[in-house]
């Protein structure tokens, strides 16, 4: 499920999961003032891969193989998807925080496990778990049944509009559209409204009004108009959030693997942070996220305390 809270995390209460109902995953949305900085402009000229890039790809493959090996060894893939996400996400604790890993020219779907930001952390965790559940029966007899390509395919399905990568503007840049699109695809279910959520007046427009901060828009100015049209569509939809004052009241309903999004009041943006819930042995809903402040993937305090 995915849930939206106001005043802190920029996600709303919504269920994330696979189309098969038995594999559905949950997540929450929260809202709070944004303090993040913008993406610096960089040279987007296409270049051959450097040795550093090759090394990063090889290291990502090594990390991926280790995660899958541990998952199969401990049979995490047999758990409900939320619990599976919790186990997989916890394996990334300590991974350094690195932003901007998706900003490639030309656009391509990429997995980089050398460093994670708040979005790529939950994206990778979700899609490794989704793939594991899809491949669960095959993995029982063949430990090599789940490949890097399988996860990349699932990631493309959730990261891009209608599940198809077709250039920079097909990526779901705004979390609010990610939610809408993945609800439509049956990947997640938004529970924000039924859990007491309030209308959230999303008015995105930051990308089209600040193209200088996005290397791809600098390189291809004609894409800005497409982005503006996407923003107008997002703004015309209905969105919901859970006010901070109500978070503690619903905290007991959170489960391990629930994805959290934190809304922002920064002009032109919708959400500023994402993460997921880990329910500990005492039943406390802790916030697991890639923290820019801690500079790593970190298991934080109670979600209500985090938002306080």
Predicted regions and their residues:
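C-terminal soluble interaction/assembly domains
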Residues: 257-308
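Bacterial Sec-dependent signal peptides at the C-terminal "C-region" and cleavage site
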Residues: 10-47
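Acidic/histidine-rich, surface-exposed loop or edge segments in extracytoplasmic proteins
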Residues: 48, 62-73, 96-108
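N-terminal Sec-pathway targeting helices
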Residues: 1-7
């Amino acid at each position: 499920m995915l849930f939206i809270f106001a005043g802190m995390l920029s996600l709303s209460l919504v269920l994330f999961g696979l189309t098969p109902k038995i594999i559905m995953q949950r997540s929450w949305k929260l809202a709070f003032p944004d303090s993040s900085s913008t993406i610096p402009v960089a040279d987007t000229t296409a270049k051959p891969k450097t040795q550093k890039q090759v090394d990063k790809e090889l290291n990502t493959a090594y990390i991926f193989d280790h995660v899958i090996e541990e998952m199969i060894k401990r049979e995490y893939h047999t758990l409900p998807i939320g619990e599976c996400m919790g186990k997989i996400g916890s394996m990334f604790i300590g991974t350094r925080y690195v932003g901007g890993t998706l900003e490639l020219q030309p656009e391509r779907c990429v997995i980089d496990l050398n460093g994670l930001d708040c979005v790529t952390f939950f994206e990778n965790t979700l899609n490794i778990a989704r793939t594991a559940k899809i491949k669960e029966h095959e993995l029982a007899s063949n430990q090599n049944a789940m490949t890097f390509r399988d996860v990349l395919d699932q990631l493309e399905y959730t990261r891009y509009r209608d599940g198809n990568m077709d250039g920079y503007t097909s990526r779901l840049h705004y979390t609010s559209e990610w939610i809408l699109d993945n609800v439509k695809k049956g990947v997640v279910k938004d529970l924000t409204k039924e859990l007491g959520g309030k209308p959230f007046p999303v008015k995105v427009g930051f990308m089209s009004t600040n193209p200088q901060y996005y290397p791809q828009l600098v390189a291809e100015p004609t894409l800005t108009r497409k982005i503006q049209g996407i923003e107008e569509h997002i703004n015309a939809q209905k969105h919901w959030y859970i006010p901070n004052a109500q978070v503690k009241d619903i905290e007991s309903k959170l489960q391990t693997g629930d994805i959290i999004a934190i809304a922002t009041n920064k002009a032109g943006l919708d959400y500023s942070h994402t993460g997921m819930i880990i329910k500990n042995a005492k039943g406390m809903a802790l916030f697991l996220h890639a923290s820019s402040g801690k500079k790593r993937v970190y298991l934080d305090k109670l979600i209500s305390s985090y938002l306080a």
